[in-house]
Amino acid sequence: MSVNVKPFFEEITIPHLNKIVNGDCYELCKELPADCIDCVITSPPYFQQRDYGSKVGEEETIDEYIHSLTKVVKELVRVVKPTGSILYNIGDKYLPNDGLQLIPYKFAEHIKNELNLYLVNVIQWHKTNPTPHQCKTRLVNSTEPFFHFALNKGYYYDKDAFEKMEVDLSSNRSDTKGLKYIDLLDESDLSVSEKRYAEQEINKVINEYRKGELYDFRIKIRGVHAPAYGGQQGGRTNQLKNQGFTIIRMHGQKMKTDVISHAVGNHKNTNHSAMYPSSLIERIVPLVCPENGVVLDPYMGSGSTAIASQDLNRNFIGFELNSEYCKLADHRIKKNQS
């Protein structure tokens, strides 16, 4: 399937749209026209981690590995629109006699400087179910970076769309959230009338939280909680002084920072560990790709990027050298469509 995209003055045909193509991503990228991809989201094979059935990751040295990745990124820069983004998730490597190698950061620094890319964020994926190890001399690694590069400072970025697709705030609401503040009123130095008014306002914010109108809230009560740090004068300090309490309402979503907490995915009856699940990518796609846009994953693996794109009404293109992974990705995509 191909799609005709009509930019300012010419018609562009994009091959391989909504398909997983078995082959070398460097060669396949050459088949794509310039400036046709809205964003790239991918996770290449890690350095000397396991046999992925591909050439990348099996290099003798880290420099050779970074060179292999950079060769592909150069093609990605060509095919990505001027407003597009490139996001790479890369894992690190411990060497027995040399410790942690900082491979992701060496790669990021190399392509940033060599290709003159604009580094937007280093999004840290916090794995809630990291792989355990028996080593007694270091902590379990539970984070991996997603490097968000843009071709220039005029990149597409829709934070509002991202926040709208987050999990419904009204789900899993605690029935006891905020009730402790009512109990704390008895420990405060508030007058009877102040306590009565405070309890009314606390019940009001609890109700807003339970209905999903707030992500979270905090309350400070005079005589119970410490005043504003440093003793700054301002609205909240004045509220504490004059009415005996202040309420901090937190609107929006939790993931406004550069940390995403999410479990690692896996698939039964395969030797492929989905280093990131589709539900994780669904939290990133709306930020960097408009609806009906095109997401490219040059190391598609088990198809997580494609599934996330499908679910969010985006087109995808996937390249994968390992034929077994292609079959797995196709199976998952068809199952997701049914």
Enumerate the language-model features and the residues they cover.
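Core catalytic lobe of class I
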Residues: 2-328, 334-336
